[in-house]
Amino acid sequence: LGHRIIDVARSALVKAYDVRLALAANGWIVTGLDVHKGRWFHLGRHEEHPARDWHSFLLIGDERGSGSRSAASRVTKLKPAQIADIIESASSREENVLLAHVHEDPELEADVFEELDDNKQARLLHARTDEEVAGLLARMRADDAADAVMDLAQERRQVVIDLL
């Protein structure tokens, strides 16, 4: 509870405020989550809000949960613009996990970078090596790649262009 997760249907980061459990043969399992924030002074109970199916959400940042829920394959099923929006609202840790999943599909990674706002894109490219930046730019549309090159530091531009 309290950790942010991806609401796949809404393509947004949300917090779980209540968990629904069921007893299975091998122990308790999560069956649903309530992402509705409780009201002040506890007016309205969580029991009054329907829990949504556990499979409608995607854990991020928890390697045990991410692996067992095939996080990478579920993240990559979102549209590039949706992934970019989620990355833009993510914390640094969440951002790193999402970028690692997206990095597994180079074409999707390029599409996501095309959708990021200019400041976020520039910051993320700054953190990569020249070779990584060149590889990413090579898969981007020409106009987006040109804009990204212009956002690079002056001393990196020619090096990256030479690597293309």
Residue ranges and their predicted role:
Residues 1-164:
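Hydrophobic packing positions in regular secondary-structure scaffolds
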